[in-house]
Amino acid sequence: MPQPSVSGMDPPFGDAFRSHTFSEQTLMSTDLLANSSDPDFMYELDREMNYQQNPRDNFLSLEDCKDIENLESFTDVLDNEGALTSNWEQWDTYCEDLTKYTKLTSCDIWGTKEVDYLGLDDFSSPYQDEEVISKTPTLAQLNSEDSQSVSDSLYYPDSLFSVKQNPLPSSFPGKKITSRAAAPVCSSKTLQAEVPLSDCVQKASKPTSSTQIMVKTNMYHNEKVNFHVECKDYVKKAKVKINPVQQSRPLLSQIHTDAAKENTCYCGAVAKRQEKKGMEPLQGHATPALPFKETQELLLSPLPQEGPGSLAAGESSSLSASTSVSDSSQKKEEHNYSLFVSDNLGEQPTKCSPEEDEEDEEDVDDEDHDEGFGSEHELSENEEEEEEEEDYEDDKDDDISDTFSEPGYENDSVEDLKEVTSISSRKRGKRRYFWEYSEQLTPSQQERMLRPSEWNRDTLPSNMYQKNGLHHGKYAVKKSRRTDVEDLTPNPKKLLQIGNELRKLNKVISDLTPVSELPLTARPRSRKEKNKLASRACRLKKKAQYEANKVKLWGLNTEYDNLLFVINSIKQEIVNRVQNPRDERGPNMGQKLEILIKDTLGLPVAGQTSEFVNQVLEKTAEGNPTGGLVGLRIPTSKV
């Protein structure tokens, strides 16, 4: 998080930031960033701190004597409190001279780009060496040090509580010490609000300054804060340890939870990695592992336990939510922009391997078989070129192979067709013919088939789409011009011609020289010509699918009429049998039904429409213009 510029602040508030003289990591000017090639120049190593500061020495100077009234609630704290030098050394890192971070060439450094905030330019970024990246601090670490107290006071003033705290809780067992329930600024999670109790929480009647927040933040009686200065990592890292203090107070668990949340900053995609604390719970139980320990407190409630041990288990689970940023010997660093993550290198492949296996299986299943052409030979030759063709990339790979498919039959013999079909069916379980255009519909977009238990008069398929369907149903009042699109009369001869043209186009495309073998100057023109041929094949395939649908519709309507004839005939036989029960010389009803089905119904169409279209094409190739379609009359102009 970028630091605010003190140049635009009020003088008293700006002086509070300028009063401290600790020299921490200093970001240099943009001129030095642009001219230096060494990425280590960004940070100056700290000189050894030669003195320690006590909060009593400079407490009034921070306040600048503006809010003296607000100090009354902290008199007891200051009288009973020891020299918390380590806490105040950490606060000095918050309140250090911010002009060192803003010592850049111009005043408009706070632009819209993140490189402006960091003082980096687009050409010479120090974040290019992986070794240096592993040593540089993460944004989450910098944010947790720079933005906790100040940002909480700016964004959450209503949630701050002024509490009289006593470092000796045993002497006052009747009072509960409550921490402030302030949410981190960057957190997107909703914190659990503490239960307001009249005897333990007092609302601040006046605005609370950042210094008061600082005092309350650093005065938890059950915290031990240790800071380790490591110059080799160029940053000062804070390690927070929260030691459990067993009390019979249910509010204590929320105190520890909020104390841990104050030391953690969620920063969107760049979050500080958590480390498990080596604390043995008093009476703990296993909880599901979540990315952050805070989410365990927010999302997971402790398992119920019998007896008085449930309270201790709740305390121990809440205390385990403490976080720390340890040194490099305990965990590996993550880059600021998550370019290099060394922790999950061994975990990610194991997590992704089942997904990759599933994707491989789906790819195998999704590769639809094309009868004859669009073969693996052609795809392996032109794989590199087709990946580079952006114009035809809209049609997916299986569409490209479908575009160049050819019918599984040959005009010479039907036996060749059966042989090719049997071989191809062994290769792939799912087949597609040249007239089956892939629309890439998801199962949710496709119409769901009705189960027999769901059939009724309203959901059964209607008969408005019969051969004369334009004169029935909702299309009765339609008086638009009859075009080729609205003409549902099948033309098997046209479908056969489209298949022959697709076969020729496939041969032309497969004979083209691969783009990778052409010189660079000739590649664009070759791609353009190949895209033209592929687009023509795609259009032909759509026409072929439309013609095949006409053939399917005709066959289904014919089968529908035949089934109605069989049903009406057997119904009449049943009526005759009931009216003349003595006439038993003929065959029984089952035999009559079988005879009707055998004489009336031919090969099944419903559920086997692809096979039906192929049979029609075989008969058309043998010289039958109607393809064996019953009742079809094709005018000579359409042949």
Swiss-Prot record:
Probably degraded by the proteasome. Residues 310-328 have a biased composition (Low complexity). It is found in: Nucleus. Residues 533-540 are annotated as: Leucine-zipper. Residues 371-380 have a biased composition (Basic and acidic residues). SUPFAM superfamilies: Leucine zipper domain. The keyword Transport applies. Keywords: Nucleus, Repressor, Stress response, Transcription, Transcription regulation, Transport, Unfolded protein response. CDD domains: bZIP_AUREO-like (cd14809). Residues 339-351 have a biased composition (Polar residues). Residues 521-584 form the bZIP domain. GO terms for biological process: maternal behavior; negative regulation of endoplasmic reticulum unfolded protein response; negative regulation of nuclear receptor-mediated glucocorticoid signaling pathway; negative regulation of transcription by RNA polymerase II; positive regulation of prolactin signaling pathway; positive regulation of protein catabolic process; positive regulation of transcription by RNA polymerase II; regulation of transcription by RNA polymerase II. Residues 302-422 are annotated as: Disordered. GO terms for molecular function: DNA-binding transcription activator activity, RNA polymerase II-specific; DNA-binding transcription factor activity, RNA polymerase II-specific; RNA polymerase II transcription regulatory region sequence-specific DNA binding. Residues 523-532 are annotated as: Basic motif. Residues 355-370, 381-401 have a biased composition (Acidic residues). The keyword Ubl conjugation does not apply. InterPro entries: bZIP (IPR004827), bZIP_sf (IPR046347), CREBRF (IPR039165). Induction: Up-regulated by endoplasmic reticulum stress. GO terms for cellular component: cytoplasm; nuclear body; nucleoplasm; nucleus. Interacts (via leucine-zipper domain) with CREB3 (via leucine-zipper domain); the interaction promotes CREB3 degradation. PANTHER family: ADULT RETINA PROTEIN, CREB3 REGULATORY FACTOR. Acts as a negative regulator of the endoplasmic reticulum stress response or unfolded protein response (UPR). Represses the transcriptional activity of CREB3 during the UPR. Recruits CREB3 into nuclear foci. Belongs to the bZIP family. CREBRF subfamily. This is CREB3 regulatory factor.
